[in-house]
Amino acid sequence: LRNVYKFASALILSAAVVVVALVYVNSSAAAAQGGPTIAKDSVQMRAFTFSSYKGSYDTFSWAPLINFRVNGPIPSGGQLYVEYTVPGAPAVKFDCSTEETPADRWWKTECGGRDGIPEEKGTTYTGPFSFAIKMRNELAGSDTTLFTGKAKIAKVHSNEIKTGKFANHFVYYVDHDWNLPIGYVYYTQDDLKGWDRPILNVAFWVRGEAVNLDPHLFYKGAEVGRIMYQGEQVGKASCESDVENNTTNFVDEKDAPQKAKWSRVVCSFNNVRGWDRSGEEPGMFGALYQLDKNPGEYELKVLWNNKLARSVKFNVPAGGKLDTSLAASNKLGTERLIVPVTIIGDQDGTWDKAAWKTDAFYGNPLTGFTAAP
């Protein structure tokens, strides 16, 4: 991963929690193409549940809540917006916070929900619906579609009683089972040495709470990246969620497995580096593990609640540079190695193992990808 992210501005608004960030990007597909592009792996569609429907508080409804990243350039006068359609209803449009962005940066925004869509536009529809991310420019007289997709809406009853006036209090959510078989391997910069000593990261999805995760990396059958000092492990690898797609209202787990929540987990290995070109001698804890000096197949095994739950295998070529060609050919918008993820055990509950074939990236499935058996 050669992108260098540095936050330059952030804006947080209430209710829809509109988060906007302008960051640097060293290499961008948009720069090569001369126009803005959407990073497909950044698009996250959720359902915002309204506590009314057509003026009645006896029935809940929903509207889309989306966040995504745009690789620049975004020209002066450019305005991002989303248009969505549910069967039997006219299209609805809502604007997203937008800022002029040069080609070497990207812009991230979250929009929709209560702040972007009037409550009277709420719907009780469930099933697939279409949406598009667009950019209009009143100054240039242009209107361009940047991304089109489909998301599947489902519902589950709220954690209230299920009778009387509460009978139609359903909470809506987007099904993200398609994410589970798809993982990513990439590097991030070292805080001090930058790309001279990049850190290994592996990302994957779980259905449920991304807590109590313990990652272990293996090479030729032996665990690597563990450094002990005076009987204590230092620089221990860790996992945490960086994306959580969940409901906006409380639901009971007995009604919705894992409470209809999907979390993207990033496991970072501080002791494992793509290479070390810093020229520094090893410190007091010893040398860091270098992938470029140990090419071949690696396997990440992850314990979740003390049970083996994930296996991710990937190859590192000589020199340590990851093969991001699959991401490039599918115009993912982010330079990452895409890898299959093996789901082990039953902690994710029952999930659709074939969803990735048609639903991945909201109806834009990967070409050239095969899920793990």
Q: Where are these predicted regions, by residue range?
A:
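Bacterial N-terminal signal peptides that target proteins for export
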Residues: 2-12
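Intrinsic disorder/low-complexity segments in short proteins, especially the signal peptide
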Residues: 6, 16-18, 27
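Bacterial N-terminal signal peptides
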Residues: 11-21
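Extracellular interdomain linker/stem segments of modular secreted and single-pass surface proteins
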Residues: 152-159, 317-323
